């Protein structure tokens, strides 16, 4: 309930959150650039970063609607990341951390300790669900 309530407050800013989180991940964790080497511009806020950040947050929005069964709800995304994109699942945790940082900066009033723990637990569940097809 806490995640759904928080998402209701921050969801309209999902595109900005996604752009900022992905930009932050690529700068702070440069080893993650390898997955985006086919993009001509990896600068923070570049068109590809913005578009993929929007896509990532679309996946998070989907996960919010599937919160009661993340494994089933994110099955297709797990398949895509495991078999097509071949993303190392440890990167999900890195991006989750960047998402938390951005939300804490953008929404300090809403990002209470209780919201923090709820969102962290939810994003960890999303990461586990996305890693499901790697087994």
UniProtKB/Swiss-Prot annotation:
**Which key words are in the record?**
Heme, Iron, Metal-binding, Oxygen transport, Transport
Q: Where does heme b bind?
A: 81
Tissue spec. comment? Red blood cells.
Query: What does the PTM comment state?
Result: The N-terminus is blocked.
**Binding residues for O2:** 52
Cellular component aspect of the GO annotation:
blood microparticle; haptoglobin-hemoglobin complex; hemoglobin complex
One Pfam family name is: Globin
Q: What Gene Ontology molecular-function terms does this entry list?
A: haptoglobin binding; heme binding; metal ion binding; organic acid binding; oxygen binding; oxygen carrier activity; peroxidase activity
Q: Which ranges carry the Globin domain?
A: 1-135
| KW Iron (keyword) present | yes
Which Gene3D superfamilies does the record match to this protein? Globins
Q: What InterPro entries does the entry give? A: Globin, Globin-like_sf, Globin/Proto, Hemoglobin_a-typ, Hemoglobin_oxygen_transport
Q: Extract one GO BP annotation from the record.
A: hydrogen peroxide catabolic process
What does this protein do, in the record's words? Involved in oxygen transport from gills to the various peripheral tissues.
Q: How does it assemble?
A: Hb1 is a heterotetramer of two alpha chains and two beta-1 chains. Hb2 is a heterotetramer of two alpha chains and two beta-2 chains.
UniProt family annotation: Belongs to the globin family.
Q: Any miscellaneous information on file?
A: This fish has 2 hemoglobins: Hb1 (major) and the minor Hb2 which constitutes about 5% of the total.
Q: Which PANTHER family match?
A: HEMOGLOBIN FAMILY MEMBER, HEMOGLOBIN SUBUNIT ZETA
Q: What is this protein called?
A: Hemoglobin subunit alpha
């Amino acid at each position: 309930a806490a995640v759904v309530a928080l998402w209701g407050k921050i969801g309209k800013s999902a595109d900005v959150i996604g752009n900022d989180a992905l930009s932050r991940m690529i700068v702070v964790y440069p080893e993650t650039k390898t997955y985006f080497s086919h993009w001509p511009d990896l600068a923070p806020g570049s068109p590809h970063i913005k578009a993929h950040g929007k896509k990532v947050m679309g996946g998070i929005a989907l996960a919010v609607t599937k919160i009661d069964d993340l494994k089933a709800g994110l099955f297709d995304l797990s398949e895509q990341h495991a078999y097509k994109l071949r993303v190392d699942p440890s990167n999900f945790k890195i991006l989750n951390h960047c998402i938390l940082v951005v939300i804490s900066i953008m929404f300090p009033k809403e990002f209470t300790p209780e919201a923090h723990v709820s969102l962290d637990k939810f994003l960890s569940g999303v990461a586990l669900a996305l890693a499901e097809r790697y087994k």
